[in-house]
Amino acid sequence: MAQKDDKTKDKGVKTRRISRRTAIKTAGVLVGAGIAGVPGALTRGMSVRSAAAAEKPIKIGFQVHRTGIGAVYGRWYERTTTAAVKLINETGGIAGRPVEVVAEDDGTDPKRGAEVVEKLAVQHKVDFVYGTLFSHVVIASAPRAGELKIPMFVASEGYHVPSGTLNRYVFQPGITDVRSQTRSIVSWVLNNLGKKATMIFPDYAFGYDHRDFFGGAVREKGGTILAQLPIPPTETSFTKYFPRIPADTEVLYHVMVGPGVLTFVKEMGEHFGAKRPQIFGFIDSLEGVDMASPGLEFLEGTYFWEGLPRYSDGYPTPYEKFFRQRVGVNDEGASIQDPKDVSTYAHMFSCWETLFVIKQAVEQSGYRDRTPKDYKALIETLENFQWFNEGIQHPQGHKKFIGRIHQSFGQQFVSEVRNRRLKVVHRTKIEDSLYPTEVDYTKQPL
């Protein structure tokens, strides 16, 4: 892909113009383009709720990690989905039709993931499959979506979508991928923390993306990877891994998920004590975990990537504030109802944004039913999208969408742990994350 094709242009929505044939679609445009900059503007859609209710619902099949190692994410992905669908239905639904979510737990298990896709498509007859997160589940589920010829919208971060290894029915428009995330922050890490890095990552596809792309970017920028340590995601004790970290490590890069992440951080602190290298982690290691938890004192002065800052002062825009309020999250990143219930705030916006992308694609393509013709129109329409404006539909920020690879690119945040909180110290630009690729899903038959 030529670099000139990837230059970011903050000049409005470059998708095909939405039809204004009905008041319902007009309401969709106001929200979608970010014109509705204040929540009050959304109330204009309330009068069309009764009309939407009379239409056949659009059914979205939600492949959710209610159990297994992804359960904490699944819980907040489900809350975010509920909040987004509630807002969509309050403002006229999608193309004048109410949205109904059919959720099925995949146990964060690859085998069950493929079964869930089939159940949603064949038994529940949903229009689309949506919401899959963990990489190994996405990789196992996506081929079944392709075989069933049903669009699948994942919220995963993995490089599996833009890599071209999946199929034309799978999109990731609501969150950026690991390759772009690591590419965008690597210069900051090398310039501010050190050039000799050791990596600790989970031993499955998501971790391999970090291994390959952060490691590759470090070498490309003149740094050195001293060691790479994969750890099984179900591991519960980590003391045997830390002695393998080379003594001359300047930066320890970690990204861990699963039930043992709190133990991982505590044991890392016990191992290093005061004589530690600089530490940079992906907040995946502590999503759903209170930064003031006992044992995390060791993290003071370390750094994390965040997709969207957990604390409200990290990115205080009216759109982020509106999103935070609608999903029920307080200024500290925890549930308003239960402050001990910490959100997965750096990731869960992807559900919100993806659902609004589905809304735009349906309305602009004229999609009505589960027919090959309508699916073709929807897929081709989405592949022609180029830009998602920051706004109520996209509170994390502007997104550049490259239809050939079915992937969005956006800004990232680097935060430092200060006084048991995360303080944003750096925000990347979209162009920092762009990479060359020859992938082109649009050439695959439907």
Predicted features, each with a name:
Residues 2-7, 14-30, 38-446:
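Extracytosolic ligand-binding ectodomains
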